[in-house]
């Protein structure tokens, strides 16, 4: 088997969104699984729209999710001399030509074609032009597309694709200012980089016949193509920012783990049996672009949150502390190691993201200043207040290093007073945490410690 070489080639005109990252992941997995090469190429030939910040954001996203590329990043803006050489080569071999048609002439031609209900297109009028060029016109360079031929390729996702060259006009490969066009530079770079397999979005499917024309004109080897359907929202519409089409780095800020995001995106358009959770090693062992789905996949926040919660639960306390550093939450330095372990172990089971986990840390460690109204209103204060007063005294005698002792103290109140557990547990929870839900009460008491637990009960009794 020949060396597999893939690439990811974004344009730095905006942030890297999840559709782009998914494409990068597919290319990365295919190359790495086959001990091949994976390159990053920045397609920055549109100098008016390029953004250094966008290019840096792409690199930053790669670093975060752990996609390591081979060699140096290739910037197309540094390769204009190479492109000019190949444009000249095509001109010298009479495979391309200068077209002197003005924009006004081209617009007029298109209007005439529309009036005749024809597809607007350039009519190849300068294809065999031998006369004197008109003055004042900076020409473009067009490729001579072979006529009456069928361009066919077997797409790894779409299957057999055939296009008659008569449907293509002699498309532009160099603008009037000499800058090369997208399809031209992509073809040159893919060929010179030795790209064997191109995995990209199916919005590029219409570009492929044009690129094959160029491959053949330059006697380059044509790579394998895999055109992946786009990601849709759960209503079957194009992704909007609200539905997930946002900067990849925003997911880090929202508290998603890179392992969860990579797993999630790899499953959008690819599957293996009914398995949902994949480590990177499993993805490398199982991924094959031939298994990519031909129908669009749907972005599901529910699925992403479920996966993230799964990965969150499997993080150690030390790993969680590292991951939580970018987020704002209460100081943990007053907790002993055992309390810290209990806090994070309890909360990671109840959190879907790091951001949510940070908020839940605050919910436990910051004393409530108000209490959940609907729960408070249901309390029988004549019964509750004496119970909490009695329990406060028990806590002063309790061993807070032993969770079972704390549990026994709560059970003792319930048994002595001959009441239902909820009649005591609910007001105690409200006193400690300010709301009717949250972590277990023995956990809360253990984490807060004697002094803080007693103080919170006293504050509640004053209300």
Curated annotation (Swiss-Prot):
Name of a matching Pfam family: Anticodon_2
InterPro entries tied to this protein: aa-tRNA-synth_I_cd-bd, aa-tRNA-synth_I_codon-bd_sub2, aa-tRNA-synth_I_CS, aa_tRNA-synth_I_cd-bd_sf, Glu-tRNA-ligase_bac/mito, Glu/Gln-tRNA-synth, Glu/Gln-tRNA-synth_Ib_cat-dom, GluQ/Sye
Motif window: 'HIGH' region: 10-20
CDD domains xref list: GluRS_core
Keyword Protein biosynthesis: yes
GO biological process, any: glutamyl-tRNA aminoacylation
One Gene Ontology term of the molecular function aspect: glutamate-tRNA ligase activity
EC number: 6.1.1.17
Positions occupied by motif 'KMSKS' region: 238-242
UniProt entry keywords in alphabetical sequence: Aminoacyl-tRNA synthetase, ATP-binding, Cytoplasm, Ligase, Nucleotide-binding, Protein biosynthesis
Reactions catalysed: tRNA(Glu) + L-glutamate + ATP = L-glutamyl-tRNA(Glu) + AMP + diphosphate
Claim: Cytoplasm is one of the keywords in the record: yes
GO cellular component entries: cytosol
NCBIfam families: gltX_bact (TIGR00464), PRK05710.1-3 (NF004314)
Function: Catalyzes the attachment of glutamate to tRNA(Glu) in a two-step reaction: glutamate is first activated by ATP to form Glu-AMP and then transferred to the acceptor end of tRNA(Glu).
Protein name, per record: Glutamate--tRNA ligase 1
Species of provenance: Helicobacter pylori (strain ATCC 700392 / 26695) (Campylobacter pylori)
Biological classification of the source: Bacteria, Pseudomonadati, Campylobacterota, Epsilonproteobacteria, Campylobacterales
Gene: gltX1
